[in-house]
């Protein structure tokens, strides 16, 4: 990258333990790999903060012109991010963490995180079984949304992608959330009542991250796919306007 053109953004999601991961099927960057990457970036690039990026949007000469600039961001308000924030603090790096407000206000997980943990903990077959129960409970046609999965025959990753597409493209906004919360409450939370803090960050950690100098950003309310979701005015305000006000207050 030509350093005079601006900056590159690196977006992280899961940062997982090196050993004894309680959720080994959650895919992500290992803690040691993450720290090695941060060390390498620190040595070879100019790592900017979110405020630096905002300054650049107003003044194109606001960034270092001698090195390539990198902004590090994190999506989804995951529990892993508190560890990441402490590693960044060790290297005097400030980042921005985008958090769905349902995690903090409602104390409920974001939509895709329910899918990740549900499949990682119980397998795709079990997840699809509870999905059918949820569809039936909400008077929705099982045949319209059902996915047939034969472990000995089908590619599991392709079937997982199909499963994700149900919630992203086929179910409407309200039904998608209702079905996912049914799966969370009747499968994931039922198995472990303390699972939410293992999935997502909590308010005291967010406060401490702000004290470290990190920035918190909105990531809609329930982590919807904005481009793929038709929203009423009320739902638009909830997903798009409320999160910004929540963090500002």
Regions found by a protein language model. Give the residues of each.
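C-terminal domain-boundary segment and adjacent tail
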Residues: 26-64, 92, 201, 207-211, ...
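Membrane-embedded segments
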Residues: 73, 79-87
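Generic enzyme active-site microenvironment
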Residues: 73-74, 217
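Metal-dependent polysaccharide deacetylase catalytic core of the NodB/CE4 family, i.e.
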Residues: 10, 15-16, 67, 91-249
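Membrane-proximal basic amphipathic "stem/tether" segments
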Residues: 1-8
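Acidic/histidine-rich helix-loop elements
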Residues: 16-29, 228
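Short, glycine/acidic-enriched loop or turn micro-motifs at the edges of active sites
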Residues: 78-79, 222
